[in-house]
């Protein structure tokens, strides 16, 4: 039994008569009595005793703490029950017990977090091994022991990160408001993929449910004009708010700040290109006492903090290593260390993360103050598409400057532009038919794949954008990285209702399609010209040259970019319009109608099934 209770005293006779039996409390606390009254007339106001009893503070649901507890339970199950099948059953029973006691949420015991629990279990195993080795070592340790520990940390880092273990990072493809996309090579099959990293700045139960739900929706999208989805997983990462240089007194070790590490050719990779955990940078000031830390050690075990370390040997050559932090804390903490932190320090279960012991060897002399934030990193593995519609339009515009006669317009290949736009509308029709609104359609999020340049829609904006860290999460100096150009680029394609913050639906995507249609058929000589024309579309102004050259396209640009949402055509209406009325497009239109009719038939079948069930119940 993890907890017990006893009921003392006699029950109220009135309650017995009423037949109401109260459930025994989980813990029997002594009855509260009124506090004795004292004469406080001569006591200063700031020292007066509170008149009301202290209220226990309420803490928000933090997934990180719960995940650590669940991981400990799973680890104990494996230790005490070697049979894998039985250990799973023991783990489930323990989780059910803790859930009933109110110590855990069933959400953190779900299979979606199995990869994170594996990460924690490996960390716990490594911590226990390191702690035992530390206890068995002599107080005075030589460099060989420290190098041995560091080599194990390097190997451990590769084991705990799926991203580092399975993929080789080749290049960064792009960055946006929801994260960064990297070109990687799978070490097993040798194929190239695109992996998008999305840093979740909050990790409450509701937030994680939103992200996981949307990932599952995206996983169900299968269409030739949608970027292919492969898999997704979550890893734990620590994001630091870097300051200046950190001196850490370890034999043959020197810790550099992120800024110095970037300048060093042999330095550590940028934080955004690695799932490893990075310890905070501190200010090189004289040692002084600091306030107590808010970091709590949940499992009362040895905490191995990480740092970006540059090893300097006798020849002054440098090699880069990274150490993992195995301790987990709240999602947003500000650790401040007093005096010196021994490597073997173990914080108290309920106490603050401080060190008062002195150690002559192997001490970490941490100076300054920093902020370490604990987040979850969502990784989405997708089909690799390197050429975007933005690249295609930019190259087309460069070629257009060679021609003076705009009426001839040889650089605008109407057939190619029509093909691109038709495939784009087909992809939008599919996602709208699935009940999904893209919200961020623009040339940078549309890709051309393969020799035939097949259109692929990607970079779906997560509807839970308020819990996704913006593009500044990789910024070194803590300042915003978004430029004026990037904001303009987003606003040019966003519908008026999106910019006004009002409710929007699939018709907002149709506005973006109207702007893209204009850009496909209207080359621009400069960025200023492009911004002026695309901004003028909001007020119904379309270039006269485009209206003369492409009257049908100009007509639908006017309809799609209209301020009246109800008058904008849908994706299906566009596919059935005169924009694509060729022999092949007629067949496509008929296929789209069949899809719509089949959907209606399925809905009618469901309604008939419900009606028949109701009649059966009435009989």
Curated annotation (Swiss-Prot):
Stretches assigned to the Protein kinase domain: 167-580
Listed GO MF terms: ATP binding; eukaryotic translation initiation factor 2alpha kinase activity; heme binding; protein homodimerization activity; protein kinase activity; protein serine kinase activity
Activity regulation note: In normal conditions, the protein kinase activity is inhibited; inhibition is relieved by various stress conditions. Inhibited by heme: in presence of heme, forms a disulfide-linked inactive homodimer. Heme depletion relieves inhibition and stimulates kinase activity by autophosphorylation. Inhibited by the heme metabolites biliverdin and bilirubin. Induced by oxidative stress generated by arsenite treatment. Binding of nitric oxide (NO) to the heme iron in the N-terminal heme-binding domain activates the kinase activity, while binding of carbon monoxide (CO) suppresses kinase activity.
Binding positions for ATP per the UniProt entry: 173-181, 196
Region (Disordered): 1-40
Site location (Heme-binding): 80
Annotated HRM repeat ranges: 408-413, 549-554
One GO CC term, this protein: cytoplasm
Keyword Cytoplasm attributed: yes
Biased composition (Low complexity): 18-28
Modified residue annotations for Phosphothreonine: 283, 483, 485, 490
GO BP, sorted A to Z: acute inflammatory response; establishment of localization in cell; HRI-mediated signaling; integrated stress response signaling; macrophage differentiation; multicellular organismal-level iron ion homeostasis; negative regulation of cell population proliferation; negative regulation of hemoglobin biosynthetic process
Consequence of substituting residue 196 to R: Abolishes kinase activity. Impaired hemoglobin synthesis and proliferation of differentiating erythroid cells in knockin mice
Keyword annotations of the record: ATP-binding, Cytoplasm, Disulfide bond, Kinase, Nucleotide-binding, Phosphoprotein, Protein synthesis inhibitor, Repeat, Serine/threonine-protein kinase, Transferase, Ubl conjugation
Free-text description of this protein's post-translational modifications in UniProt: Activated by autophosphorylation; phosphorylated predominantly on serine and threonine residues, but also on tyrosine residues. Autophosphorylation at Thr-485 is required for kinase activation. The active autophosphorylated form apparently is largely refractory to cellular heme fluctuations. Ubiquitinated and degraded by the SIFI complex once the mitochondrial stress has been resolved, thereby providing stress response silencing. Within the SIFI complex, UBR4 initiates ubiquitin chain that are further elongated or branched by KCMF1.
Domain of life, source organism: Eukaryota
Disulfide bonding pattern of the chain: none
Disulfide bond is among the record's keywords: yes
Loss of function: phenotype: Mice are viable and fertile without gross morphological abnormalities but display hyperchromic anemia in animals suffering from iron deficiency. Dramatically altered response to diet-induced iron deficiency shifting from an adaptive decrease in red blood cells (RBCs) volume and intracellular hemoglobin content to an increased production of abnormally dense red blood cells (RBCs) with decreasing red cell counts. The decrease in RBC number is the result of increased apoptosis of erythroid precursors. Diminished levels of phosphorylated EIF2S1 in bone marrow-derived macrophages (BMDMs).
Tissue expression profile of the protein: Expressed predominantly in erythroid cells, mature reticulocytes, as well as fetal liver nucleated erythroid cells. At much lower levels, expressed in hepatocytes and bone marrow-derived macrophages (at protein level).
Enzyme class: transferase
Stated induction or repression of this protein's expression: By phenobarbital.
Catalytically driven reaction(s): L-seryl-[protein] + ATP = O-phospho-L-seryl-[protein] + ADP + H(+); L-threonyl-[protein] + ATP = O-phospho-L-threonyl-[protein] + ADP + H(+)
Family: Belongs to the protein kinase superfamily. Ser/Thr protein kinase family. GCN2 subfamily.
Subunit note: Synthesized in an inactive form that binds to the N-terminal domain of CDC37. Has to be associated with a multiprotein complex containing Hsp90, CDC37 and PPP5C for maturation and activation by autophosphorylation. The phosphatase PPP5C modulates this activation. Homodimer; homodimerizes in presence of heme, forming a disulfide-linked inactive homodimer. Interacts with DELE1; binds both to full-length DELE1 and processed form of DELE1 (S-DELE1) in response to stress, leading to activate its protein kinase activity and trigger the integrated stress response (ISR).
Protein name stated in the entry: Eukaryotic translation initiation factor 2-alpha kinase 1
Record organism: Mus musculus (Mouse)
Upper lineage: Eukaryota, Metazoa, Chordata, Craniata, Vertebrata
Name of the gene this protein is made from: Eif2ak1
């Amino acid at each position: 039994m993890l907890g017990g209770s006893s009921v003392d005293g006699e029950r109220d006779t009135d309650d017995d008569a009423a037949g109401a039996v109260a459930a025994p409390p989980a813990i029997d606390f002594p009855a509260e009595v009124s506090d004795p009254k004292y004469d406080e007339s001569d006591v200063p106001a700031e020292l007066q005793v509170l008149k009301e009893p202290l209220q226990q503070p309420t803490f928000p649901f933090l997934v990180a703490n719960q995940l650590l507890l669940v991981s400990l339970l799973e680890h104990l199950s494996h230790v005490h029950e070697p049979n894998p099948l039985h250990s799973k059953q023991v783990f489930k029973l323990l989780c059910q017990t803790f859930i009933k006691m109110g110590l855990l949420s069933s959400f953190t015991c779900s299979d979606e977090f199995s990869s994170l629990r594996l990460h924690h279990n490996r960390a716990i195993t490594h911590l226990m091994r390191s702690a035992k080795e530390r206890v068995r070592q002599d107080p005075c340790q030589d460099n060989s022991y420290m190098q041995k520990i560091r080599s194990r940390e390097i190997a451990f880092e590769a084991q705990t990160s799926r991203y580092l273990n399975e993929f080789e990072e080749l290049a960064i493809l792009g960055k946006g408001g929801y994260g960064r996309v990297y070109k990687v090579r799978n070490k097993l099959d040798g194929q190239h993929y695109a992996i998008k990293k999305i840093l979740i700045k909050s990790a409450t139960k509701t937030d994680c449910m939103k992200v996981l739900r949307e990932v599952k929706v995206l996983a169900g999208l299968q269409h030739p004009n949608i970027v292919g989805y492969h898999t997704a997983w979550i890893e734990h990462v620590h994001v630091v708010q870097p300051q200046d240089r950190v001196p850490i007194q370890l034999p043959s070790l020197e810790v550099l700040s992120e800024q110095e590490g970037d300048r060093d050719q042999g330095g550590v990779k940028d934080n955004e290109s690695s799932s490893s955990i990075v310890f905070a940078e501190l200010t090189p000031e004289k040692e002084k006492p600091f306030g107590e830390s808010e970091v709590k050690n949940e499992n009362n075990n040895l905490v191995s903090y990480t740092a970006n370390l540059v090893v300097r040997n006798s020849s002054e050559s440098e090699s880069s290593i990274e150490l993992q932090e195995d301790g987990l804390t709240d999602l947003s903490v500000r650790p401040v260390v007093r005096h010196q932190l021994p490597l073997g320090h173990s914080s108290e279960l309920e106490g603050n993360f401080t060190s008062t012991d002195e150690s002559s060897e192997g001490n970490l002399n941490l100076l300054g103050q920093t902020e370490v934030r604990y987040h979850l990193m969502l990784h989405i593995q997708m089909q690799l598409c390197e050429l975007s519609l933005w690249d295609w339009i930019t190259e087309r515009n460069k070629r257009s400057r060679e021609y003076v006669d705009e009426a001839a317009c040889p650089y605008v290949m109407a057939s190619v532009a029509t093909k691109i736009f038709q495939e784009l509308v087909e992809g939008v029709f599919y996602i709208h038919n699935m009940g999904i609104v893209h919200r961020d359609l623009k040339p940078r999020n549309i890709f051309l794949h393969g020799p035939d340049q097949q259109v692929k829609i990607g970079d779906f904006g997560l509807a839970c954008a308020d819990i996704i860290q913006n593009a500044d999460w990789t910024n070194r100096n803590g300042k915003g990285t978004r430029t004026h150009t990037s904001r303009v680029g987003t606003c040019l394609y966003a519908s008026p209702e999106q910019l006004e913050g009002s409710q929007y639906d699939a018709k907002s995507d149709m506005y973006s399609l109207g702007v893209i249609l204009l850009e496909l058929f209207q080359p621009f000589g400069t960025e200023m010209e492009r911004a002026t024309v695309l901004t003028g579309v909001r007020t119904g102004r379309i270039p006269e040259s485009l209206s003369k050259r492409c009257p049908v396209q100009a007509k639908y640009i006017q309809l799609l970019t209209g301020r009246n949402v109800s008058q904008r055509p849908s994706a299906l209406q566009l596919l059935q319009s005169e924009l694509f009325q060729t022999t092949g497009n007629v067949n496509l239109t008929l296929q789209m109608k069949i899809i719509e009719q089949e959907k209606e038939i399925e809905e009618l079948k469901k309604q008939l099934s419900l009606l028949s069930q109701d009649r059966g119940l009435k009989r």
